[in-house]
Amino acid sequence: MALQFTEREFIPVLLGGDINAYSVARAFYEEYQVKSLVFGKYQTGPAYRSQIIDYTPNVDIDTMPVMLKIVNGIAQAHADKTIVLMGCGDNYVALVAQAKDADELADNIVAPYAPYSMLEQCQKKEIFYELCEKHGVPYPHTFTFTAQMLNAQGEAPAEVLDQIDFPFPMILKPSDGIMWWQHEFEGQKKAYEIADRAELEQVIRDSYASGYTDDLILQDRVPGNDEYMRVLTSYSDRNGKVRMMCLGH
């Protein structure tokens, strides 16, 4: 059976090409029967060739000049519509928020994001754990490694690592996920399960040698597979009040 589409008073414009972009486009289709315009970097990924998506690759879509030219062009071409602009990835959200703050988006574009200064703080993991501490939300035992702890050779001193009071294997992840992916290096991962001291020293050395300058978060590993994971998604209005929440398992 062929998919059915309905013309609405808005057009979803999504930035990104991975499963996040596809999931948002699917949600728009299931609720409103609209086709989303999706812009990713490459001709690949879950969003590419999907029947519910009009996908356009552009290797520079994650740069401000190219993003503005594309989305403002869409807004101009569809002046009678509201353009709902969403970033499907931390870097795209930051890009859109910065453009919104600078008032560089066309008047008929809606970008549902808080000011960039607030987003920048919220996406840093050590800030998140400070909020957990403040509000009594439990989280794994954590040690924060900073660039200032490195010695002159760009390595983690033994006396610093000796302060970690939880065992291997441990989890290591960057505090600033946006900056992290801007400095690629061999073997780079979103998060690591560190087996021993030698691997910990190597990952720290490689991370900062790449040009990454923010903190690294080391945590006690919580045992169990993905069946024990949960994800909480919430929506807040323009006044910062949470209006809905959805727990995923």
Regions found by a protein language model. Name each.
Residues 34-37, 139-140, 216:
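Hydrophobic anchor at the start of a short beta-strand
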Residues 161-171:
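Acidic/histidine-enriched active-site and ligand-binding environments that engage anionic O-linkages
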Residues 121, 126, 144-150, 158, ...:
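Domain-scale recognition of functional cores that engage charged ligands
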Residues 195-249:
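Phosphate-binding site of ATP-dependent enzymes
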Residues 106-109, 116-138, 156-157:
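Glycine-/Pro-rich loop/turn segments that contact NAD(P) or position catalytic residues
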Residues 1-115, 150-159:
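ATP-binding N-terminal substructure of ATP-dependent carboxylate-amine bond-forming enzymes
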Residues 141, 169-205, 229-231:
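Glycine-rich phosphate-binding loop of ATP-grasp-fold ATP-dependent ligases
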